[in-house]
């Protein structure tokens, strides 16, 4: 369980990747909420603040991930990305799964969510204070490539 309860939910504007984003800090302290991404093509994407999603082209019949109601998307851990990071610290191997939805999480962490001001990019960030590492991933859409996910790992110590 996360032990950084003194951190409060807050909102602010931040610039990175040549774009301006609205940041919601400490989303782990909030119940999951639904977000959509704007698109200038036939791509649609609905995401939960916990990382689950549904997306596709044209309509629900062309869904890439199962098209479900928001309550089901919030609880499903099988719709969306999964990342497992192996870290060796002092000769000991540790596994970290950012945005793990399980109740038991052995690490102290902070989760932040960023949406750009155009509404067509969404960034998830988890900072692992125990292992001194952070993980970010961004969802965008592209008429040529479809749904695009990029990710980044940063050592914070």
Which positions does each model-derived feature cover?
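Anionic coordination/interaction segments
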Residues: 1-157
């Amino acid at each position: 369980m996360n032990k950084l309860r003194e951190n409060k939910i807050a909102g602010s504007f931040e610039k990175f990747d040549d774009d301006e984003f609205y940041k919601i800090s400490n989303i782990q302290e909030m119940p999951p909420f639904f977000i959509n991404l704007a698109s200038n093509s036939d791509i649609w994407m609905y995401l939960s603040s916990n990382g689950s999603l549904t997306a596709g082209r044209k309509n629900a019949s062309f869904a890439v991930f199962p098209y479900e109601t928001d309550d089901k998307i919030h609880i499903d851990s099988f719709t969306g990305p999964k990342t497992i990071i192996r870290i060796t610290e002092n000769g000991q191997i540790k596994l970290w799964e950012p945005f793990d939805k399980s109740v038991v999480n052995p690490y102290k962490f902070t989760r932040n969510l960023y949406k750009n001001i155009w509404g067509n990019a969404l960034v998830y960030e988890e900072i692992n204070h125990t292992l001194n590492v952070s993980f970010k991933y961004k969802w965008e859409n592209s008429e040529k490539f479809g749904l695009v996910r990029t990710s980044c790992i940063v050592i914070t110590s």
